[in-house]
Amino acid sequence: MSNNHPAKYTDVIVPVLAEYAQGATSILDPFAGTGRIFWLHEYLPGVRIEGLEIEPDWETDPRTTIGDALNPPWGPNTFDAIVTSPTYGNRLADHYKAKDGSRRRSYRHSLGRDLHPNNSGRLQWGKKYRVFHVEAWGAILPLLTPGGVFVLNIADHIRNWKRQFVSRWHFETLCAMGLTPERGRKVVTPGLRDGENRELRIGYEYVMKFRKN
């Protein structure tokens, strides 16, 4: 098992997620990774938190449910908050098998094997990435109660010297699926400093809050 997940929630993101989820009684992270969503208990004591993760080989928090976000094991209207950070479609989705000593990072390299076919960590930003996330949001949003909040942590990246507007696409897609935006914030983050375009890394991520009508 491995807890060397290359894209965990950063320390500065967690309190913003907690702020945006204030008032929730039940929270789901459908892309839970190693389980840092449970850090929200420090800010929101007494809240029920569930995490869903497709890769059992991540050293996940024992409270995490192993399963597929495309087919979540809960019924409609189970949670009054969804708090999550999907993959960003950046170079962490590379499938290369790094040689010893390589400083470049990817989900595959960190896990030490190929990813599950339904793991979006396999997908570079593009049509397949967008199709996957439309399907994923379509499976997850019914779990959210009417009036519930959806908190999204997402970031853009640079590819071939051009900014890829991943965050804008998620924002527009979630709005088109019936969510109403309420708040948003840029959060300065350290980010990764290895690999291609490292000198052009975007130094912040977005946290967005939506409400289900």
Positions of predicted regions on the chain:
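Class I S-adenosyl-L-methionine-dependent methyltransferase catalytic core
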Residues: 1-213
